[in-house]
Every structure is written in structure tokens, then in C-alpha cells.
């Protein structure tokens, strides 16, 4: 099932991308002093 493998890899990629964006957002929030 090559389709399953592709979906799996794609999901992993999306998760990594989402995690990266979340980290970036956290850093921005901390810089603004929104997180105390």
C-alpha cells in the first residue's frame, strides 16, 4: 500500500511543520511580553 506510506509521511511532515509554526508563535509571543 504505497498510498498509506505516502499519507503517513505527509502527516509526519504536516506535524513537523505545525510544530515549527507553533514554536515560532511562542517565540514571538514571548518577545512581545504577552506570555508572563
From Swiss-Prot:
Sorted alphabetically, which SMART domains does this protein's record hold? GLUCA (SM00070)
Compartment annotation: Secreted
Q: Which UniProt keywords apply?
A: Hormone, Secreted
Annotated TM spans:
none
Coiled-coil blocks: none
Provide the primary localization.
Answer: secreted
| GO MF annotation list | hormone activity
Kindly summarize what the UniProt induction comment says about this protein's expression.
Answer: Produced in the A cells of the islets of Langerhans in response to a drop in blood sugar concentration.
Task: List the GO cellular component terms.
Answer: extracellular region
The protein's matches in PANTHER family, at most eight in alphabetical order, are given as: GLUCAGON, PRO-GLUCAGON
Q: What does this protein do?
A: Glucagon plays a key role in glucose metabolism and homeostasis. Regulates blood glucose by increasing gluconeogenesis and decreasing glycolysis.
Annotated family: Belongs to the glucagon family.
Q: What is this protein called?
A: Glucagon-2
Task: Provide the species name.
Answer: Huso dauricus (Kaluga sturgeon)
Amino acid at each position: 500500500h504505497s498510498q498509506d506510506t505516502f499519507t503517513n509521511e505527509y502527516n509526519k511532515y504536516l506535524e513537523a511543520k505545525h510544530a515549527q509554526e507553533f514554536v515560532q508563535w511562542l517565540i514571538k509571543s514571548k518577545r512581545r511580553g504577552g506570555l508572563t
